[in-house]
Each structure stands twice: as structure tokens, then as C-alpha cells.
Amino acid sequence: MNIAEYHQNIEQVWLQIEEQLEEQGCDVDCDTQGSVFTITFADRSQIVVNKQEPLLELWLASKAGGFHFAFKNNQWIAQDGKLFWQCLEQACLAHGEQVNFS
């Protein structure tokens, strides 16, 4: 994957997150600032999904933990085999919102 494809892929992920949160009626605010996408929950807690361009990785940080994902076989996968969408669902649940990104 080249740099342009990397950015396009992550921006598509961000769009999908925002659309799913809105469609499922979650009480959150989403914001993008440069390479950082932030989901802010009603209690002001946050999930941060950000680009790590030098590594071509996608990072996820929340009170559920921090994860680094590489794009393999058309999906974002952590070194331990966890899938990005599953980790994001678990992170949202830890912040009080049940969301299905599948």
C-alpha cells in the first residue's frame, strides 16, 4: 500500500465509524484534527483513532487499552491477531455505548 492508499483507507475507516455511530443513535461527538479522529462520549471520555504514517499503521487508544494495527489481507489487524473493528466495539462498550461495526 502506498501513502495515498493508506490515507484514503484510514479516512474511509473514520467515515464508517462516524456513520455507524450516528445510525445506531450513539450519544457521541466525532472530530477530526489532522491525523487524529476522536470520539467523545457523554461522560467526556474519549477514544482516539489516529494515523501513524511512518509505520503505515492505525492506532486505537481508549480506557480499554491501546492497540496498533497494520493493514493485512484487506483488514486492520494487531500483532496479536485482534481485528480493528472488534477492538473498537469493545472500546465503545467500555465507554458505555454498545455499537456493532460488523
Swiss-Prot record:
GO terms for cellular component: cytosol. It holds the Pfam family Frataxin_Cyay. Involved in iron-sulfur (Fe-S) cluster assembly. May act as a regulator of Fe-S biogenesis. SMART domains: Frataxin_Cyay (SM01219). One of its GO terms (biological process) is iron-sulfur cluster assembly. Gene3D superfamilies: Frataxin/CyaY (3.30.920.10). GO terms for molecular function: ferric iron binding; ferrous iron binding. It comes from Histophilus somni (strain 2336). This is Iron-sulfur cluster assembly protein CyaY. Keywords: Iron, Metal-binding.
